[in-house]
Amino acid sequence: RDCKSDSHKFHGACFSDTNCANVCQTEGFTRGKCDGIHCHCIKDC
């Protein structure tokens, strides 16, 4: 099961899944992707 959370460190509009994922990894998540203009972090629960 995936747990999703808005990124707390990502600033600005999200246009790159790679940038979002890199920021999410610094927050303890395994991956991340853009959802609209927001960066959402994902990890296994």
Swiss-Prot record:
<comment type="similarity">
    <text>Belongs to the DEFL family.</text>
</comment>
<feature type="disulfide bond">
    <location>
        <begin position="24"/>
        <end position="41"/>
    </location>
</feature>
<keyword id="KW-1015">Disulfide bond</keyword>
<protein>
    <recommendedName>
        <fullName>Defensin Tk-AMP-D3</fullName>
    </recommendedName>
</protein>
<feature type="disulfide bond">
    <location>
        <begin position="3"/>
        <end position="45"/>
    </location>
</feature>
<dbReference type="Pfam" id="PF00304">
    <property type="entry name" value="Gamma-thionin"/>
</dbReference>
<dbReference type="InterPro" id="IPR008176">
    <property type="entry name" value="Defensin_plant"/>
</dbReference>
<feature type="disulfide bond">
    <location>
        <begin position="20"/>
        <end position="39"/>
    </location>
</feature>
<dbReference type="GO" id="GO:0031640">
    <property type="term" value="P:killing of cells of another organism"/>
</dbReference>
<dbReference type="GO" id="GO:0050832">
    <property type="term" value="P:defense response to fungus"/>
</dbReference>
<feature type="disulfide bond">
    <location>
        <begin position="14"/>
        <end position="34"/>
    </location>
</feature>
<dbReference type="InterPro" id="IPR003614">
    <property type="entry name" value="Scorpion_toxin-like"/>
</dbReference>
<keyword id="KW-0611">Plant defense</keyword>
<comment type="function">
    <text>Plant defense peptide.</text>
</comment>
<dbReference type="InterPro" id="IPR036574">
    <property type="entry name" value="Scorpion_toxin-like_sf"/>
</dbReference>
<keyword id="KW-0295">Fungicide</keyword>
<keyword id="KW-0929">Antimicrobial</keyword>
